[in-house]
């Protein structure tokens, strides 16, 4: 597992690139395999197109960019601004130009041998796909020489994402990462899904862990994280309002009906709360949107159907729709042809730029990342107005809000750790009494 450079010196930096973007392009190209954890609005689209163009100038071969639904159009618009026309969006695997964009869902149409570089836009979205698509992407990426992952800040304590990102880039594997830096509470290896509960960073390995992550990634929430000026990157005000809906249905606990609604503690209880309050929450949402340009972020098909019933002028995005239909609706909303959209954060919460909209209604879940990404569709650089997010939740689900607050604090801590250790060199002391510093075998 080498952690050296696999790339080359950059040959092309767009004239319109800011200094921190130029730095990111140069470092990424030199590295050849890197994860860019840049927050929303920092120009990841421009950076990715520039990376692709550099690979073409160096190799005269093709680069594939994988994107979430409806994001491909944003790449075409950005490329036009940059003066790059050797780019196309392919929906069926046919391509004639050097930079090829496709959706994750359409990857099965493409062959690895046709590409020398691959860029995963919003790579965090992989966790939302079923096993088949995830396996296809992983297998595809591992066969490509130049690999780039691009997404916003990793979820707080989502070490799974960091481990799988490292593995996809060809560095330390997920299980090797666990062995090297983590300790198991139950003294067993456990599964990937419960790492948050079963594993924790070894105290003495914490700084080394974050230094290691920084050997194969770039992370920034603001240009200043990379040593540049924040001028022009100050966000407008974000206002988050909590609307607590009283659950007036009788709740059964251990066979007894409760006069007062107990706080839901388990996933089963939370789902029961969601189900028993869905109409009241939807009614409140319609009241809050009140004819504005807005997005309703819901979680279930039932909620989506009720919202559509109560707001007939809104358009739905649902899983059963064809890819083409979803793209059509999402593009229409982005172009201002649709005023209100009903969708789910796990489906359309990543990659889309909706600065024309500054209001949203959100049904919170345990997922910090889904909420963060959903909010950042509107609250991003280029937004001219204050952004209002109305969270609607039942009185029995307040633990969800508490959990999200805790995860927000952890996200801030994760960002602090990664940026503080950005210049640390990852080394390993063989023994305490041995002053000689040795690189571990995987380097």
Named regions from a protein language model:
Residues 2-37:
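Conserved pre-motif I regulatory segment
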Residues 226-315, 319:
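Conserved helicase/translocase motor-coupling segment
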Residues 295-297, 305-306, 312-348:
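Conserved helicase ATPase core of P-loop NTP-dependent helicases/translocases
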Residues 31-51:
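Walker A/P-loop
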Residues 366-443:
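A conserved SF2-helicase RecA2
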Residues 60-62, 81, 117, 125, ...:
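Conserved P-loop NTPase motor "coupling/switch" region that bridges the ATPase
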Residues 70-93, 171-172:
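Conserved helix-turn-beta segment of the N-terminal RecA-like "Helicase ATP-binding" lobe
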Residues 45-50, 60-81, 156-161, 300-301:
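Conserved Walker A/P-loop ATP-binding site and its immediately adjacent core
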């Amino acid at each position: 597992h080498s952690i050296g450079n696999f790339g080359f010196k950059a040959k092309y930096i767009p004239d319109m690139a800011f200094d921190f973007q130029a730095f990111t392009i140069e470092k990424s190209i030199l590295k050849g395999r890197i994860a860019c954890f840049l927050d929303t609005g920092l120009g990841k689209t421009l950076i990715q197109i520039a990376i692709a163009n550099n690979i073409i100038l160096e190799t005269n071969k093709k680069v594939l960019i994988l994107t979430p639904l409806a994001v491909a159009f944003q790449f075409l618009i950005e490329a036009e601004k940059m003066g790059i026309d050797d780019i196309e969006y392919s929906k069926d695997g046919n391509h004639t130009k050097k930079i090829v964009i496709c959706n994750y869902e359409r990857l099965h149409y493409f062959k690895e041998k046709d590409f020398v570089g691959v860029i995963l836009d919003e790579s965090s979205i992989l966790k939302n796909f079923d096993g088949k698509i995830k396996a296809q992407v992983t297998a595809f990426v591992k066969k490509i020489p130049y690999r780039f992952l691009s997404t916003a800040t990793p979820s707080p304590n989502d070490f799974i994402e960091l481990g799988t990102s490292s593995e996809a880039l060809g560095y330390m594997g997920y299980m090797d990462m666990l062995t090297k830096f983590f300790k198991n509470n139950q003294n067993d290896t456990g599964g990937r899904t419960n790492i948050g509960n079963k594993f924790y960073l070894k105290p003495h390995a914490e700084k080394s862990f974050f230094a290691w992550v920084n050997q194969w990634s770039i992370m920034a929430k603001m240009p200043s994280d990379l040593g540049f000026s924040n001028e022009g990157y100050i966000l407008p005000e974000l206002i988050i309002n909590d609307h607590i809906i009283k659950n007036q249905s009788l709740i059964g606990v251990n066979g007894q009906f409760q006069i007062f609604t107990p706080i839901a503690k388990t996933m089963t209880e939370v789902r029961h709360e969601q189900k028993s309050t869905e109409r009241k929450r939807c009614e409140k949402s319609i009241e809050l949107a009140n004819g504005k340009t807005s997005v309703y972020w819901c979680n279930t098909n039932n909620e989506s159907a009720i919202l559509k019933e109560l707001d007939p002028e809104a358009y739905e995005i649902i899983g059963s729709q064809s890819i083409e239909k979803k793209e059509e609706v999402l593009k229409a909303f982005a172009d201002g042809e649709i005023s209100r959209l009903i969708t789910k954060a796990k489906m359309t919460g990543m990659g889309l730029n909706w600065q024309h909209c500054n209001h949203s209604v959100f049904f919170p879940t345990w997922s910090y990342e889904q909420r963060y990404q959903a909010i950042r569709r509107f609250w991003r650089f280029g937004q001219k107005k204050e952004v209002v997010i109305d969270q609607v939740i039942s009185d029995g689900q307040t633990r969800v809000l508490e959990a999200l607050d805790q995860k927000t604090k952890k996200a801030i801590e994760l960002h602090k750790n990664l940026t503080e250790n950005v210049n640390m060199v990852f080394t390993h002391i063989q023994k305490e009494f041995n002053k000689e510093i040795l690189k571990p075998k995987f380097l």
